[in-house]
Swiss-Prot record:
Protein name per Swiss-Prot or TrEMBL: Small ribosomal subunit protein uS17
Keyword tags: Ribonucleoprotein, Ribosomal protein, RNA-binding, rRNA-binding
Family the entry assigns: Belongs to the universal ribosomal protein uS17 family.
Native source organism of the sequence: Methylorubrum extorquens (strain PA1)
Protein purpose: One of the primary rRNA binding proteins, it binds specifically to the 5'-end of 16S ribosomal RNA.
Gene Ontology terms describing biological process: translation
Phylogenetic classification of the source organism: Bacteria, Pseudomonadati, Pseudomonadota, Alphaproteobacteria, Hyphomicrobiales
Amino acid sequence: MPKRVLQGVVVSDKTDKTIVVKVERRFTHPVMKKTVRRSKNYHAHDEANAAKIGQTVFIEESRPYSKTKTWKLVEDQAAAAEAAGTAA
């Protein structure tokens, strides 16, 4: 089974090797038929302390690192865009 990958914005990077990522999802309310936005914060492992507040990042499911931390940082979009720009 493939690991889930989510995209979100870093809202906190205060703890060592941990970031908090806010992931927003949109869905149509079953009764009101209106598009609703809901967000959830995920704690993710950031081995290199690379992510900064405000960056858009991808996180993926992984083994439990602690009681609340079961996601890990895959890449941040700024670094991916920079790498693509230098490679071209």
